[in-house]
Amino acid sequence: MVDRRTLASLFRLAALSAAIPASLAGQTIALRTVPVATGDQFLVHPSRNLAMGSVSIALDDPWLDPFLNPALGSLLDESAFLASPTFYGIEGDNGAGRTVPLSGLFSGRRWFGGVAVALQQIVDENGSPAWIVRPGPWLDLRQPRRLDAADATNSYASGFLGLRLSARWSLGAGAAVAKLNAVDGVDLLYAGSQFIDQDGKIWDVRAGLVGDLGEERRLEAAVVHHRFSMNHDVGYLEWVWDPETMQGQVIERIEENLDRTSTTGLHLVFTAPVGERWRAGPTFTVNRKSHPKIPNYDLMNVPRDPGNSWAFNMGVGLGHQRGPLRFGVDVIYEPVWSETWAEAADTVRTTGGTLLQPGDRTVENDFFLSNLHLRLGIGRETERWGFQLGLGASSHETQLEQWNVVEAERREQDESWMEWTPSFGAVLKFPDAEVRYAGRMTTGTGRPSVDFAFREGTDRANDALAAADFLIAPSGPLILQEARVITHQLTVRLPLR
């Protein structure tokens, strides 16, 4: 049987990826250890290549690239205003989101820049039901659903500014902030909770450099620092027995949990011609992650679980652009090493008789993640219309080695899964406007849960609790109820001439 603490540790590492916006993932690497269906909450910037599998290494995305590496704004050929309403839903009423991003891109003779704002609604389809055993027919625990716990509003803002230093070199800097009242799926992380009030923020700063090395060879470099901070006020309804009145009572208990993660990263890309109208080159990314505080979710019986991670991203891209035809392929390998640990809150005696003091490590976890990503896309755009097709495939493998200091036990666990993301799009072009639709569907993820036959009766209502971005996994073998994620984005672009 899989150990409860082992699965809890796997989930803790999976939870760290929540702070990474998908649209900024070029320089920040998400850590994922379980195949949870994730919505596109952080898709808050327009993208020309979204329907082409989001290929990016050797095929430019002039709308998204400047927000990833601000110096790439030097490649803008004209100023434009863009509106990109985005909608996503997770199959099985597991959540949905609606976002309205507005962006402006400016290109001058020497200076260039851009700004983007977005307003978002996160919809909790299921709510957060309370699961409490009723001791008798006289106790009715049915509670009205809190409307303020169902939906939440988030706001985002980002911008960049750059300068063409010469005909070959450009420099840029950018920043992004977000005010969050919900991270999709967190409501289901706390088993048995009646309501969850979330409040937090994200801030991100980055700088970039782009250089033409001659003969159409290009070097791109970017550095980024990203911080995520959330507070969770979680309310529980608990049944207690009053010996004086000889009756049961329901009381409300509120817990405050903190979620903190910071990431510092370096991103490099080199591309060069490899034939007529073809480009290719390697990419390399390194992230140093610090996890000073991860929330104590309802299943987590070992609180105060800090950690550190080193994540790498290395790959190669191939791109082709000839007339109306565009084609791109990305192949990326991601190795990640992560260490987390639990610290004793009080004095603890090990099974061997050693006395651990407060602050000493009680559990040590060593993770190795091995991920492989393949993205390809093709599109054809004429002066009036166009289409795009894409496919993304990802292989995820996780190895965990856990040392329980208190019980002197060592455990190992391996997890693996595949994800598939087909995408498609259409383009209509007018003399003074462009309308672009992109849709994609992610399969291979869903709602992980524990096999009922192996569920422990001592667990507190933690069976099959899954969310859009996270998972609480109780003790026992895991099974997967697949839930597709479907995303639609409609972009309207108006050139500013």
Regions found by a protein language model. Name each.
Residues 25-128, 149, 415, 440-443:
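N-terminal, post-signal peptide beta-strand-biased segments of exported outer-membrane/organellar beta-barrel
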Residues 52, 102-108, 157-163, 205-211, ...:
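Residues on the lipid-exposed face of transmembrane beta-strands in outer-membrane beta-barrel proteins
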Residues 56-58, 85-91, 117-123, 175-181, ...:
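Transmembrane beta-strands of outer-membrane beta-barrel pores
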Residues 64, 94-100, 151-157, 199-205, ...:
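Residues that define the transmembrane beta-barrel architecture of outer-membrane proteins
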Residues 94-97, 125-134, 178-195, 231-247, ...:
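Outer-membrane beta-barrel translocator domains and adjoining extracellular loop/strand segments
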Residues 95-233, 237, 250-253, 261-279:
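Transmembrane beta-barrel wall of Gram-negative outer-membrane proteins
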Residues 426-433, 468-469, 474, 480-497:
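Outer-membrane beta-barrel "beta-signal"
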